[in-house]
Amino acid sequence: MHPASESSHITRLAESIVANTAIVNAYLCEQNLPLPRFDDINAAVRPCTADDASAESARRAVVTASQELRDLLSGPSAPLMVDWTAHSCLRTIVHFRLAEAVSLVPANDIGTSFANIAAQTSLSETHVTRILRHAMTRHIFREPAPGFVAHTAASALLSRDSVTRDVVGLITDEMWPAGLKVPEALARWPNSQEPEETGFSMANAQGSEEQKKSMWSVYEEDAERARRFGVCMSVENSAMPFPLEELEWQGLVVDIGGGVGFNVFNLAEKHQNARFIVEDLSKTVQQGRLLLPKQLKDRVDFVEHDFFSPQPVKDADIYFFRRIFHDWSDKHAVEIIRSLIPALKPGARVRVNELLVPKPGELPREIEKMARNSDFAMLALLNGKERNNEEWQALFRAASDKFRFGFCKTTPPGLMAVIEFVWEP
C-alpha cells in the first residue's frame, strides 16, 4: 500500500486543477470579466480566456486534467458506456425547437411552464417534461420552480443563436447517423477510398446499393442541408484559424477551391504587391464576383475550375489549397495534386492549409482528441482523412518525386498548419 502522504497521480491532477483554476479566476477578476455560471444566459460562445494565451493555456490544462481525473475515478467501464441518450435528447430538442419555446428571462424569473412549452409544439406535456428534465442533467435548461423551465447558458445559446442550432443539427442529423454506419461501410467496402462508399452514404441510402451517393451528391439535391453544412464549415474554419497574412505572398497566387474569396480578400488587403485568382465551381464563382470589394477588382479575379481538371492558370508563383485535401482519400488527393503539374513552372510553390494531426502524446489530450475526432469524421463522411507531417510529405511524393518539401508551420495550440512544397523539375 502507498503511504497516505505520498503524492499520487490523482492528487497531482487535483493540484494541477486547483493551481490552474486559480490562474483563470485571477485573470477573469483582473479583466473584470464574468465568472462562468450555468445560469448566465448571456454567456459568450468563445471561452472566457480566449484573448489571453497564458489564461487560455491554464483553462485548457484544467479541462484536460479534470477529464483525466474523472476517467480515472469512474473506473475502466465508464469510457465504454457511451451516453447515446444525450445525442437523441439533443436532437429531439432541436427538431421540435424546444429551446425557443422557453422565454429568455432574467435568472430570478420563474421561467416557462412545461404546459406552455408543450402548447407551442405538437408534443404532450408529459413528453416535454421528460425530454427537458433529461437535458437538465447536463446543464441544458433548469427547473427554478416545480413545473417551470428556465434557460441555462447552454440552452439560451441554443435558443438565440441560429448558427449553434445549425451546428447541433449537423452533428445529430448528419454526423451521428453516418458514424453509426461506419462498421457496416467498412465491412461492405473494405479499404475503399471512394466518397460514395462511406457511413454517410449508407445512412442516406435510398433503394439499392447501386444508387449509393457521396455526401456532395446528397447535398446537391437538398439545398437546406447544403446551407446548414456551409454554415458549419464556416464556423469550423473560424474556430481553427491560421494567420495566413503573416506568410509571404507575392507574384500571382491561385486559391484553388477558394469559395467566394474571403481568404483572398483578406490577403489582398495586406499584401498589396500580389495578384490573386480564386478558383471554384460556377455558382460559387458567381457569388464571389458579387462580393468582391471594389478596391480589389484590379488585383483579384475569379475563374471557374474543378480541381480534378488540369489547372488552367499556368506559371503562377503560389498555388494555395485551404481545407480541401482532408475531404479526399490519398488516391483522390494525389489526383488533385497531379492536375497541377502541367501548369507549374520551376520554383512554383504549393501551399496547403490544413489541420495537422499530432504524434500520439505530442499535444495535450484535449487537443489531440480534436484532431482524432476530425479524422474519424472524415472517414465516416467522405473516406477522407486528416494527415500528419510525414503523411503530407508522402502524399506529395506519391504525386511526383519532383516536389521538394519546403516547410511546415503551425500556430498555437498546434493543430492548424501551412505545409509548403516547391516544384523542382
From Swiss-Prot:
tRNA processing recorded as keyword: no
Residues that bind S-adenosyl-L-methionine: G257, G258, D280, D306, F307, R322, R323
UniProt EC number: 2.1.1.-
Natural source organism: Alternaria alternata
A molecular-function term among this protein's GO annotations: O-methyltransferase activity
InterPro entries, per the entry: COMT-like, O_MeTrfase_dom, SAM-dependent_MTases_sf, WH-like_DNA-bd_sf, WH_DNA-bd_sf
Induction profile: Expression is up-regulated more than 10 fold in toxin producing cultures.
Known function: O-methyltransferase; part of the gene clusters that mediate the biosynthesis of AM-toxins, host-selective toxins (HSTs) causing Alternaria blotch on apple, a worldwide distributed disease. AM-toxins are cyclic depsipeptides containing the 3 residues 2-hydroxy-isovaleric acid (2-HIV), dehydroalanine, L-alanine which are common for all 3 AM-toxins I to III. The fourth precursor is L-alpha-amino-methoxyphenyl-valeric acid (L-Amv) for AM-toxin I, L-alpha-amino-phenyl-valeric acid (L-Apv) for AM-toxin II, and L-alpha-amino-hydroxyphenyl-valeric acid (L-Ahv) for AM-toxin III.
Other facts: Gene clusters encoding host-selective toxins (HSTs) are localized on conditionally dispensable chromosomes (CDCs), also called supernumerary chromosomes, where they are present in multiple copies. The CDCs are not essential for saprophytic growth but controls host-selective pathogenicity.
Protein name: O-methyltransferase AMT9
Pfam family, one: Methyltransf_2
Superkingdom field: Eukaryota
Pathway it works in: Mycotoxin biosynthesis
Record family assignment: Belongs to the class I-like SAM-binding methyltransferase superfamily. Cation-independent O-methyltransferase family.
Gene Ontology biological-process entries: methylation; secondary metabolite biosynthetic process
The entry's keywords: Methyltransferase, S-adenosyl-L-methionine, Transferase, Virulence
Active site, renumbered: H326 (proton acceptor)
SUPFAM superfamilies registered for this protein in UniProt: S-adenosyl-L-methionine-dependent methyltransferases, Winged helix' DNA-binding domain
